Amino acid sequence: MPADRLGAHMSIAGGLHLALERGKTTGCSVVQLFVKNQVQWAARPLTDEDVRRFKKARRTTGITEVFAHSTYLINLATPAEAEWRRAVDAFADELGRAEALGLRFVVIHPGSHKGSGLEAGISRIVAALDELAGRIRGYRVRIALENTAGAGHTVG
């Protein structure tokens, strides 16, 4: 890894591997990307070919430091049980995708407590992270919580 690092969030349009090629073209040594469409819950599974192309692009571009960012739909702080369960399951899927790609971190905004209060929101986040820790036991990928400006009911 170069001493001077420059990174950007790159589009995965056309394939995950293309995000690395776009990063290289723009002079990046670090790239952040989504491991699936950032505004949809559903995603087709990663294929062996997707993973092979991505790992090859890491080698050929020299961009070895790649961070994933979770989709914007995931809200680990929500008080609504069905929404919380869907968020935890979706984030577990994204962590699995990142693991398959050999990524070290998935960045996530903790979410919004939607008026239930900061303490309640933090409790929901902790419960989600506890469950996820069990579900990703043995994975190398880690969760990186990204702070927010704290507007409205956001936590972090």
Residue ranges of model-derived segments:
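N-terminal pre-domain/capping segments
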Residues: 1-70, 74-93
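Active-site acidic/histidine proton-transfer and metal-coordination neighborhood
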Residues: 76-156
